[in-house]
Swiss-Prot record:
The gene is fadR. This is Fatty acid metabolism regulator protein. The keyword DNA-binding applies. It is found in: Cytoplasm. It comes from Serratia proteamaculans (strain 568). Its main location: cytoplasm. Residues 34-53 bind DNA.
């Protein structure tokens, strides 16, 4: 187990999460007693208690007052916020995880972008107008792409779509930083934003779903072509 945390709390958190992931503390079992676990990890009980509370909020654990702390099946109890952690823990599954992420984006974006163009075309146009000022480099496009999808999600009138994108931000933008290093990706994105802007102007909301799905297909093809050179630290946080 290689842990890169910089603080005792960070070390304890990574230790427990990796132990759950590697079945040292399997789902459905109980954690060792607080005193034993703090000695095992090498942190104070106060620090451990804070870490356990945080992991419980994220769905990894269930703290039962007066009873031992239970390890959850995190796939059933956690939210989108653990995607980055899962990607870091299981490098071999990262390509499939990202494929699933992009598929989800296309499927829900087809719905909320259509709603934005139909119900709030002026707001959608304002979001898409940002694309006319973007610098032709990876970080700029990465930020723009996230802001456009998130902005259109909120412009749909259903804030739940926006909250979903908030939850996806970490992994989404790390993948995007690599994806938009390809000039073809940036060119395709600009064409997509321009088509959406035209559909907004023409109020042709009935064509939005096909537009989004075609973009998902074309961008997915570019992504597949880039997987062979995907950096091993793609899902690691910048330090």
């Amino acid at each position: 187990m290689v842990i890169k945390a910089q603080s005792p709390a960070g070390f304890a958190e990574e230790y427990i999460i990796e132990s759950i992931w590697n079945n040292r503390f399997p789902p459905g079992t109980i954690l060792p007693a607080e005193r034993e676990l703090s000695e095992l990890i090498g942190v104070t009980r106060t620090t451990l208690r804070e870490v356990l509370q945080r992991l419980a909020r994220d769905g990894w654990l269930t703290i039962q007052h007066g009873k031992p702390t239970k390890v959850n099946n995190f796939w059933e109890t956690s939210g989108l916020n653990i995607l980055e952690t899962v990607a870091r823990l299981d490098h071999q599954s990262v390509p499939q995880l990202i494929d699933n992420l992009l598929s989800v984006r296309t499927n829900i974006a087809a719905i909320f972008i259509r709603a934005a163009v139909r119900n709030h075309p002026e707001a959608a146009q304002e979001v898409l107008a940002k694309a006319t000022q973007v610098e032709d480099q990876a970080d700029a496009f990465n930020l723009l792409d996230y802001e456009i999808f998130r902005g259109l999600a909120f412009a749909s009138g259903n804030p739940i779509y926006g909250l979903i994108f908030n939850g996806l931000k970490g992994l989404y933008t790390r993948v995007g930083r690599y994806y938009f290093s390809n000039p073809e990706s940036r060119k395709l994105a600009l064409t997509f934003y321009s088509k959406l802007s035209t559909l907004c102007h023409e109020k042709s909301y009935d064509q939005v779903m096909d537009c989004v799905r075609n973009y998902g297909k074309d961008s997915g093809a570019i992504w597949q072509s880039m997987q062979g050179t995907m950096p091993s630290d793609l899902t690691e946080a910048r330090r």
